[in-house]
């Protein structure tokens, strides 16, 4: 078996901005959090500029690109406004996600199969600007196939349903979701897509999914920012990196077969 590269950790700083915006003003600064994440060994920074600007602001995205020497993953809705902003900021990648104003967080995956007409020109415009395109989707065969057909470079598999089932002790459902994720990772890699995963991951679930040999990157935010309240961001990231490394090491032990 070929030696696998370590799984990259992308740190999402959205919820530093959530705390800032709860009171207004400039603090805590999500760009400072991104700098601390880099110092702690993060491989990339993720931030979601929502249409309602509930946490990350336009200026945050511009500063993250200008001040943080790490790949920037710009999460956004597939709208003309967001595509124009992304083409100006020029992040390393854009991850297209579904958005509903009434949701507290991104609740489901993008319907790539059902929104081809809307997605295709926006994906093409981002790629023409030299931006890699990722689609945040469920581990569903039709969605993964659509992502490849649309010309996406990456799929980020939505791990939220699995993580919720694990946390709530719904063991049968958790195992079924895990099997779906494993099959989805295999399908996506087989179609030439780079495979990422994220949403709801903690130390234990990140370790387990890092054992999928197809996984290249995990994007984690809310859990790490919550842990940082108690142990500091550097320690939270260090422990997460160790968990991910342990999961990747399990590939050689046959745990991901």
Swiss-Prot record:
Q: Which CDD domains match?
A: PNPsynthase
Q: Does the keyword ATP-binding apply?
A: no
Keyword match Iron-sulfur: no
Keywords attached to this Swiss-Prot or TrEMBL record, sorted alphabetically, are: Cytoplasm, Pyridoxine biosynthesis, Transferase
Gene Ontology cellular-component terms for this entry are:
cytosol
Q: Name one GO biological process term.
A: pyridoxine biosynthetic process
Annotated SUPFAM superfamilies: Pyridoxine 5'-phosphate synthase
Biological or metabolic pathway of the protein: Cofactor biosynthesis; pyridoxine 5'-phosphate biosynthesis; pyridoxine 5'-phosphate from D-erythrose 4-phosphate: step 5/5
Family note: Belongs to the PNP synthase family.
**Its quaternary structure?**
Homooctamer; tetramer of dimers.
**Name recorded for this polypeptide:** Pyridoxine 5'-phosphate synthase
Name of the gene this protein is made from: pdxJ
